[in-house]
């Protein structure tokens, strides 16, 4: 029969061959015609490099087939192959050597059969038919050798037509290998195949075991749509890039095209469309990106930091990350350290489950933040979803699936976008970030699907402190949903919230539209009292205010109640109890304030000012303060600037040591005054005070204690007569 051989110059050679001819024979015929030595020839058919010892019929090469001839580059070089045991093998190779050739060289050196070798470079598994130069492997590059696990198994591939293909595979096969097997069976080119498992599109460079695909698993095959189109990518500098793409292109492909045009590495690119960050493994059509759509390109900030991940066993893992890392990236790092597959990981921060496509900076996760790792329970089960039309959908799920995952499965079955779905179970609307097990949804449970009315709107929630919270809601949201949104923003448990609108308390099971709450309406949030009690607040004018409070109320809450009664803004209030100024973030119970206790209200003087603090070393510190700041506050500011703990600080002004509970205005400290900072010596001691009656009192003091402080010790009643004007006592100091 006749076959054709096409060279890179475009020339076509015609050869007379037989199906039983080896590739070696064919190369000899080419040498006879063109004078090219066989060892400089590489023959390619259907995307594969042909091996010398195989025949044309082995490759299903038939009459009038066309082979492609590529010349091997001359240029010997050394590369290194590192094994998992740490051993490094040195190989003499050429850039034109195939991965298959390299494996043969490894077999010659180490005796490992090629079919048990997996070679990795730059994080990718290398394919037998490709060359070293295809992967940009240069002299002294290091490849990593991983041995294939022996464990052949069958998997199934289901097409959209309903046909099921059976494949013989190994857990270590790459998705690319699987696509090649599908091509062998069905003739579908790999670049037209998309493989889906557990709702995820599988990436070429990953292995079946990476996705936990086991024997008799079923993959779904979707053909890529052919249909080129233009899209635009806008950078933060305002530049617009035009790209030729297909709906079936992955986000990874798009980033590669941007790299080709602009030279920006894919790992520094974040693509945004319709306010969402796009995930590498998803396609443009997955995000409904159509011709002439505009994506926004944001560069990832380079700024490594450490975060901690705490497991339920109490173990803490340290990770090196960047603010721009996605949660998916973080899970991959945890897998590298701990061997836990990403799909079994749930990461929690500030009480929220983190979503794969979002970044650490999206969640305001900063250096030395701690995430909590919860393992997903393995245990597939069936649940039912009932629509308002009466139709029942059956879903295969796991207890650890999020509501978001469930909505995605409904979208796969019914085509309803997740943002139009509301799922109800036991009378409650289910939140995207929570799991089925969080709601105690078990096998054969029935969820109810309600379609969202299109009509998002903003409402405001005003607290007793005067703070206004803005919420994104829909008229169909229940009051329970609204309370959950408030909890997400403010951390207030729903059972401590009372919402008031138009003078009425709102009931959990009713919706905003039931109460005619429309866009930009304002609700009022009142906290439910836990264990109410009365306290009194006495002002400098002598007026006494009675307040209903709870031990768990913060000082901030108390100030808000005073504002409600007296109209005094919280930032002008100072509350004093037992001689101490009370801090906003602390609770009444923190200060042991009980029923019928009396607080004292002092108004803050308006007037920020600068003061100076001079240390014994001669250094001068400048502080921004108010006359109403306590000495304790000032010491805290010094700690912020200089790192000196407050209990080691003594502040002196006009020859007097300043007391923590007093304010700057109490000492007549005005703008640009200078305080002196003396460090307390660590070294407590006992002294004795002998009275004229012969009684001896023992006191625990420090060398830095003032006489005034000694007079105020627990025996202060006894010592009240000791003052500058009274006769001196016979005190012996030891």
Swiss-Prot record:
The record marks 54, 72 as: Interacts with activating enzyme. One of its GO terms (cellular component) is mitochondrial outer membrane. InterPro entries: Ubiquitin-like_dom, Ubiquitin-like_domsf, Ubiquitin_CS, Ubiquitin_dom, Ubiquitin_ubiquitin-like. There is a cross-link at residues 6, 11, 27, 29, 33, 48, 63 (Glycyl lysine isopeptide (Lys-Gly) (interchain with G-Cter in ubiquitin)). The modification Phosphoserine is found at residues 65, 141. The record marks 68 as: Essential for function. Disulfide bonds: none annotated. The modification ADP-ribosylglycine is found at residue 76. SUPFAM superfamilies: Ubiquitin-like. There is a cross-link at residue 76 (Glycyl lysine isopeptide (Gly-Lys) (interchain with K-? in acceptor proteins)). Keywords: ADP-ribosylation, Cytoplasm, Isopeptide bond, Membrane, Mitochondrion, Mitochondrion outer membrane, Nucleus, Phosphoprotein, Repeat, Ubl conjugation. Residues 1-76, 77-152, 153-228, 229-304, 305-380, 381-456, 457-532, 533-608, 609-684 form the Ubiquitin-like domain. PANTHER family: UBIQUITIN. Ubiquitin is encoded by 4 different genes. Uba52 and Rps27a genes code for a single copy of ubiquitin fused to the ribosomal proteins eL40 and eS31, respectively. UBB and UBC genes code for a polyubiquitin precursor with exact head to tail repeats, the number of repeats differ between species and strains. Belongs to the ubiquitin family. This is Polyubiquitin-C. It comes from Mus musculus.
């Amino acid at each position: 029969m006749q076959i054709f051989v096409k060279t890179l110059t475009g020339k076509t050679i015609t050869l007379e061959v037989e199906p039983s001819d080896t590739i070696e024979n064919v190369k000899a015929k080419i040498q006879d015609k063109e004078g090219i030595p066989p060892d400089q020839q590489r023959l390619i058919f259907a995307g594969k490099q042909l091996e010398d010892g195989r025949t044309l019929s082995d490759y299903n090469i038939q009459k009038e087939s066309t082979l492609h001839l590529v010349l091997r580059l001359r240029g010997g070089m050394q590369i290194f192959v590192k094994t998992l045991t740490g051993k490094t093998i040195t190989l003499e190779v050429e850039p034109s050597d195939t991965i298959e050739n390299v494996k043969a060289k490894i077999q010659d050196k180490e005796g490992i059969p090629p079919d048990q070798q997996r070679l990795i470079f730059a994080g990718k598994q290398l394919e037998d038919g490709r060359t070293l130069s295809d992967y940009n492997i240069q002299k002294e590059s290091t490849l990593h050798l991983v041995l294939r696990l022996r464990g052949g198994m069958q998997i199934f591939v289901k097409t959209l037509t309903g046909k099921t293909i059976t494949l013989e595979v190994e857990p270590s096969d790459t998705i690319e290998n699987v696509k090649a097997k599908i091509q062998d069976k069905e003739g579908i080119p790999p670049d037209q195949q998309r493989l889906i498992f557990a709702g995820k599109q599988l990436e070429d460079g990953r292995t079946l075991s990476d996705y936990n695909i086991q024997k008799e698993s079923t993959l779904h095959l979707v053909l890529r749509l052919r249909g080129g189109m233009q899209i635009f990518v806008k950078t933060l500098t305002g530049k617009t890039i035009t790209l030729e793409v297909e709906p079936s292109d992955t986000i990874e492909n798009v980033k590669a095209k941007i790299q080709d045009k602009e030279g920006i590495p894919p790992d520094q690119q974040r693509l945004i469309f319709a306010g969402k960050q796009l995930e590498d493994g998803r396609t443009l059509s997955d995000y409904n990106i159509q011709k002439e759509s505009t994506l926004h390109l944001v560069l990832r900030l380079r700024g490594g930091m450490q975060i901690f991940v705490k497991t339920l066993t109490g173990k803490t893992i340290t990770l090196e990350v960047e603010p721009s890392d996605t949660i998916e990236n973080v899970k991959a790092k945890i897998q590298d350290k701990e061997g836990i597959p990403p799909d079994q990981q749930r990461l929690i921060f500030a009480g929220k489950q983190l979503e794969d496509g979002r970044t650490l900076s999206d969640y305001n996760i900063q250096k030395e933040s701690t995430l909590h790792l919860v393992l997903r329970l393995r245990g597939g089960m069936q649940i039912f979803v009932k629509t308002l039309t009466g139709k029942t959908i059956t879903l295969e799920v796991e207890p650890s699936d999020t509501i978001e995952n469930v909505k995605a499965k409904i979208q796969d079955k019914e085509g309803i976008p997740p943002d139009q779905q509301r799922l109800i179970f036991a009378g409650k609307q289910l939140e995207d970030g929570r799991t089925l097990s969080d709601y105690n949804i078990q096998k054969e449970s029935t969820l109810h699907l309600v379609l969202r009315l299109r009509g998002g709107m903003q409402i405001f929630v005003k607290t007793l402190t005067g703070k206004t919270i803005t919420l994104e809601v829909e008229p169909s949201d229940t009051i329970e949903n609204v309370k959950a949104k408030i909890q997400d923003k403010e951390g207030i448990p729903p059972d401590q919230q009372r919402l008031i609108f138009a003078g009425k308390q709102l009931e959990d099971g009713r919706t905003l539209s039931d109460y005619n709450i429309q866009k930009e309406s304002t609700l009022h949030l009142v906290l439910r009292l836990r264990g109410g009690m009365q306290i009194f607040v006495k002002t400098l004018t002598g007026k006494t205010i009675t307040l209903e409070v709870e031990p768990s109320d913060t000082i901030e809450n108390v100030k808000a109640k005073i504002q409600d009664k007296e109209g005094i803004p919280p930032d002008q209030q100072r509350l004093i109890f037992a001689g101490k100024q009370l801090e906003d973030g602390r609770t009444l119970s923190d200060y042991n304030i009980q029923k019928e206790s009396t607080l004292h209200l002092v108004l803050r003087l308006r007037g920020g000012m600068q003061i100076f603090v001079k240390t014994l070393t001669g250094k001068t510190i400048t502080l921004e303060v108010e006359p109403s700041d306590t000495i304790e506050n000032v010491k805290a500011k010094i700690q912020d600037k200089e790192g000196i703990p407050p209990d080691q600080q003594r502040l002196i002004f006009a020859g007097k040591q300043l007391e923590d509970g007093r304010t700057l205005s109490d000492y007549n400290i005005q703008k640009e005054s200078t305080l002196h900072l003396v460090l307390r010596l660590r070294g407590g001691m006992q002294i004795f005070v002998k009275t004229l009656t012969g009684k001896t009192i023992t006191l625990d003091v420090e060398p830095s204690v003032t006489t005034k402080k000694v007079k105020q010790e627990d025996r202060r009643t006894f010592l009240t007569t000791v003052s500058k004007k009274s006769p001196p006592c016979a005190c012996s100091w030891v």
